[in-house]
Regions:
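Claisen-condensing/thiolase-fold acyl-transfer catalytic domains that form or cleave C-C bonds
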Residues: 93, 103, 110, 128-130, ...
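Conserved beta-ketoacyl condensing-enzyme motif
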Residues: 43, 47-145, 289-305
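Glycine/charged-rich beta-loop-alpha catalytic/anionic-binding loops adjacent to active sites
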Residues: 85-86, 118-122, 144-156, 196-201, ...
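Short, well-ordered amphipathic alpha-helical segments that serve as non-catalytic structural scaffolds
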Residues: 45-49, 97-113, 169, 213, ...
């Protein structure tokens, strides 16, 4: 049975940082190293990002840029702690920001759906950038409020394709309550895990990632033959773990935050793997890649988008929505694909649409909307 997307809401933290200021912040945190500073500048300039939102108070950014200490934040560069804040300090910030930002996205989605919050039967939360319990799910139940008897599921630590896993979970759980609304919320606070040491493979993530949250209200199509309010209907999904790629992208808990490694081999792997796999998936639905009107591809970075455009013969402007979202908010991990779908809906993008995400594994997730 198909799954209707009734609405999508999104939210970003208040602290807005241009890519130029983000580079200055990185250079200040990392300290002097002439050759590496030049390399870092090229990385930040080549990301296709104009600005990002960070889950810290604005005074923290002002302090780093001006060399002051009004905020007394653990995120300020400290000689006695060269690796930056501890994981606990980063998780304290995650707990402060995660619930309220998820709440903003949820309120937006619920307002657009006209669904009574107390009628939500299933709640799915998605995040890979932090932990605390009682968590985001219970924050939403208290503050929206939702029914205290809503059934909860958490999709955790799956990386940038996590929202697609959340949508798949919503599809399955919606079958338990036909015709009743399901809420799926993804929220990430990647900037809390900025790396403070000169390790190039880990510093690329500092240049790419931002923070944000998005929410979807969904409902199984049974009993609702009319088109959903967004016109977005999930027809199917697929998943693929690429062989011999385990170490190309990793996301692990460390003593000073979570650490990501990104191999420069990933774009070549995408070009090699994606065409055959996606063609097989679409064939199961009577489609070919040429039938797809738009591709909502998670913008892991400009080189990933280039690789997808080449692999699928989309041309240079084939992923304009993905590049626009990357420029406006950066790579915000799991919610990013929801931001892209929201943008497509606002400009009334014709169907079908395929959403794609990439994560540690290397894993590829796809969702087909018709």
């Amino acid at each position: 049975m198909a799954l209707d997307v009734l609405s999508i809401g999104s939210a970003v933290p208040q602290t807005l940082v241009s890519q130029e200021d983000a580079l200055t912040i990185a250079q200040t945190i990392l300290g002097p190293d002439g050759e590496d500073r030049e390399w870092l500048g090229k990385v930040y300039a080549g990301c296709g990002i104009g600005r990002r939102h960070f889950s810290v108070h604005g005074q923290v950014v002002k302090d780093i840029l001006s060399g002051t200490n009004e905020s007394n934040s653990p995120f300020l560069p400290r000689k006695q702690f060269p690796a930056g804040p501890t994981t606990k300090e980063r998780m304290d910030h995650y707990e402060e920001f995660a619930g309220p930002l998820a709440m903003q996205a949820t309120q937006s989605a619920l307002a657009d759906s006209a669904v009574d919050p107390k009628s939500i039967r299933q709640l799915i939360t998605v995040s890979c950038t932090g932990f605390f319990s009682p968590g985001i799910d219970q924050h939403l139940i208290r503050e929206v409020p939702l029914s205290p008897e809503v059934e909860r599921t958490h999709v955790g630590f799956m990386g940038c394709h996590g929202a697609l896993n959340g949508i798949r979970a919503a599809h399955g759980l919606a079958s338990l309550c036909p015709g009743e609304p399901v809420l799926m919320v993804a929220g990430e606070h990647c900037s809390l895990h900025n790396h403070y040491l000169w390790e190039k493979e880990k510093l690329v993530a500092n240049a790419l990632f931002g923070d944000g949250a998005a929410a979807m209200v969904l409902r199984q199509s049974i009993g609702h033959p009319a088109e959903p309010s967004t016109g977005l209907r999930l027809a199917g999904s697929a998943s693929c773990i690429v062989p011999n790629s385990t170490d190309l992208m990793t996301w692990k808990v460390g003593d000073n935050g979570f650490t990501m490694t990104l191999s420069p081999r990933i774009p070549a792997l995408v070009r090699r793997t994606l065409p055959g796999w996606i063609t097989g998936f679409l064939a199961e639905h009577g489609l070919t890649p040429a039938d797809i009107k738009a591709w909502a591809v998670h913008p892991g970075g400009p080189r990933i988008l280039d690789a997808v455009e080449e692999a699928l013969n989309l041309g240079q402007n084939g992923l304009e929505d993905s590049r626009t979202i990357l420029a406006e908010v950066g790579n915000i991990s799991s919610p990013t694909v929801m931001f892209i779908l929201q943008r497509m809906l606002r400009r009334q993008q014709p169907m079908p649409i395929v959403a794609l995400g990439f994560g540690p594994g290397i894993a590829i997730e796809a969702a087909l909307f018709r």
